[in-house]
Amino acid sequence: MAEVGEIIEGCRLPVLRRNQDNEDEWPLAEILSVKDISGRKLFYVHYIDFNKRLDEWVTHERLDLKKIQFPKKEAKTPTKNGLPGSRPGSPEREVPASAQASGKTLPIPVQITLRFNLPKEREAIPGGEPDQPLSSSSCLQPNHRSTKRKVEVVSPATPVPSETAPASVFPQNGAARRAVAAQPGRKRKSNCLGTDEDSQDSSDGIPSAPRMTGSLVSDRSHDDIVTRMKNIECIELGRHRLKPWYFSPYPQELTTLPVLYLCEFCLKYGRSLKCLQRHLTKCDLRHPPGNEIYRKGTISFFEIDGRKNKSYSQNLCLLAKCFLDHKTLYYDTDPFLFYVMTEYDCKGFHIVGYFSKEKESTEDYNVACILTLPPYQRRGYGKLLIEFSYELSKVEGKTGTPEKPLSDLGLLSYRSYWSQTILEILMGLKSESGERPQITINEISEITSIKKEDVISTLQYLNLINYYKGQYILTLSEDIVDGHERAMLKRLLRIDSKCLHFTPKDWSKRGKW
């Protein structure tokens, strides 16, 4: 068995922790750092295959020294493009690299879409030609069993979901059914390349390079051991004390403090409670700077220009970085607008969360970063932020999508919002003149301001799309309908467009913003 003094950075061994059920478990963890406080060693551990927000300092009593794995000495590897080659490349990038090295030419798909493996009984149905309309006596029964969704490359000759083809609605067994027409009489390909998760981030399955602009941008570099470790112990913000999840580039001298004190109105940071109290006697703000563009009840939204209110915007980014791992901080906030959601009481407007967006986005992004502060999570505020971002897009007359990559919690929130919003549209369709109502993907996108790609990926994620006799059929089972109705009953916070006072600006005509 190894001794405590032999433990170094890079070692792996089981570490005792409590799980969600308050039970002891021994997951494998990596030692990222070692420090000595008053003669007692502390070890900063990252639990393998766990989110980094669970990383923590532990004592040697929680380490299983019998199963320690010492780091292997790595052979020196040549650098690629002038960058150190100590960290293995991501699988997505290694595949094309290996293919090029072998001299093979990779096929470039013209289009990528999602397909479903349908049961054989659905594919071969007696009676009727492919061009005939589907009737309620067809085989479109509610599909109660779980089927795996698959991604496949589609050649130009293979039909893909049409964005303008109308969707028909007809009832069966008390549940609504939608049928989206497409090119008839073509067979589907069956080769599978991945899962529907890929459709959220990019159309070709290969992550794009991060944009090096803006206040918070994609972070793909985790080589620096310093940025892999939480550096702030605790933050006091108003009546809340927050435990940061990730590294944030606050000044080095603040990282040794037991508590970092923030003014909840201007977000300036101080070393002590005395500093905060002195600041509060001088701070005139009782709400975020900028214009209040929405108020309903106790909820307000403030629009803040990253150029006009640079200090506040930078402090907001520093605070947000404590809870966002997939982004890295930049101090150029000029190209961004910040929308801060607050909750009002007799003391002022308290920050709940925020999202930022580019003043000019060539990729139709309506959100760059989005965050609900931990004390307000799981209360419906996340969806309210998302709904507000799309409400702004509606006023601007645009469709929008969040900047990728999304965090794990962000992806869950967006999928939930997209699903509820699209199902709300589909279930609200009414028939006219006795005919089945029809709708296209383009129309759904225009009504909701959700980008067409997100509409399609959501329908695929919900497993609503089936291909039958040359048509793409949207099938809403009773389980889907019941689940949606239950979810909407719990969603009490909604954006009221009548309470929004917002005039979009044409930033392209304003020079340097």
Swiss-Prot record:
Effect of K187R: In K6R; abolished autoacetylation
Effect of K327R: Decreased autoacetylation; leading to decreased acetyltransferase activity and ability to acetylate FOXP3
GO biological process: apoptotic process; cellular response to estradiol stimulus; cellular response to glucose starvation; cellular response to glucose stimulus; cellular senescence; DNA damage response; DNA damage response, signal transduction by p53 class mediator; DNA repair-dependent chromatin remodeling
A GO term from the CC aspect: piccolo histone acetyltransferase complex
Mod. after translation: Phosphorylated on Ser-86 and Ser-90; enhanced during G2/M phase. The phosphorylated form has a higher activity. Phosphorylation at Ser-90 by CDK1 or CDK9 is a prerequisite for phosphorylation at Ser-86 by GSK3. Phosphorylation at Ser-86 by GSK3 (GSK3A or GSK3B) activates acetyltransferase and acyltransferase activities. Phosphorylation at Ser-90 by CDK9 promotes KAT5 recruitment to chromatin. Phosphorylation by VRK1 following DNA damage promotes KAT5 association with chromatin and histone acetyltransferase activity.
Domain Tudor-knot span(s) in chain numbering: 8-65
GO MF annotations in UniProt: acetyltransferase activity; chromatin binding; DNA-binding transcription factor binding; histone acetyltransferase activity; histone H2A acetyltransferase activity; histone H2AK5 acetyltransferase activity; histone H4 acetyltransferase activity; histone H4K16 acetyltransferase activity
Protein name: Histone acetyltransferase KAT5
Gene symbol of the encoding locus: KAT5
